[in-house]
């Protein structure tokens, strides 16, 4: 008995970690990181075809674009000093030097991952529908701004 793509997707989303690793066997011969990337790419596409959702990172902008799936792609940034301050606020015991080092290392890791799997430059404004500096609006203001933009996009699509 063959499962429909939707029921297969439902089954995959409810698997244990051990079962997910077995499921990766369809990417036989790939290293684990590549298998994870291609598996999550399939999941992102399947989810995007079924419903609206928010995903942070995972090269979702490129994955959805390359698969012709309509989406809104947003890149949020802030000056390094504000990011350091925020990192200190949410991670007790982190001093400025460690926070700066952590963020620089994280940015480098994100850029490498994104560049490797997409062939694009991470953070390049041409890759996104909207780029926003959260320092200009604060966290809550940035969220409100994005929600208004998404609402306008949905209203526009309804009227077409």
Regions found by a protein language model. Give the residues of each.
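ATP-dependent small-molecule kinase phosphotransfer cores
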Residues: 1-52
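Short, amphipathic alpha-helical "lid/cap" segments that border enzyme active or binding sites
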Residues: 41, 139-147
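Small-molecule kinase domains that catalyze NTP-dependent phosphoryl transfer to phosphate-bearing small molecules
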Residues: 7, 11-22, 95-140
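Conserved nucleotide-binding/hydrolysis micro-motifs of P-loop NTPases
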Residues: 60-61, 77-83, 137-138
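Conserved phosphate-donor/acceptor-positioning beta-strand/loop module used by diverse small-molecule
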Residues: 67-90, 96-105
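RNA pseudouridine synthases
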Residues: 47-50, 57, 63-67
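C-terminal helical "lid" subdomain and adjoining coupling/linker elements of P-loop NTPases
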Residues: 153-160
């Amino acid at each position: 008995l063959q499962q429909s793509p939707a029921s297969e997707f439902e089954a995959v989303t409810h698997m244990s970690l051990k079962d997910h690793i077995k499921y990766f066997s369809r990417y036989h011969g790939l290293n684990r990181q590549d298998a994870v990337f291609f598996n999550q790419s399939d999941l992102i596409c399947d989810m995007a075809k079924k419903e609206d959702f928010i995903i942070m990172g995972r090269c979702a902008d490129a994955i959805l674009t390359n698969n012709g799936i309509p989406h809104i792609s947003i890149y949020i940034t802030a000056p390094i000093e504000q990011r350091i301050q925020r990192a200190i606020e949410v991670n007790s015991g982190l001093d400025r030097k460690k926070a700066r080092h952590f963020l620089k290392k994280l940015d480098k890791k994100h850029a490498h991952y994104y560049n490797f799997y997409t062939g694009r430059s991470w953070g390049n404004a041409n890759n996104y529908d909207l780029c926003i500096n959260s320092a200009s609006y604060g966290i809550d203001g940035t969220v409100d701004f994005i929600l208004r933009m998404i609402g306008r996009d949905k209203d526009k699509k309804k009227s077409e």
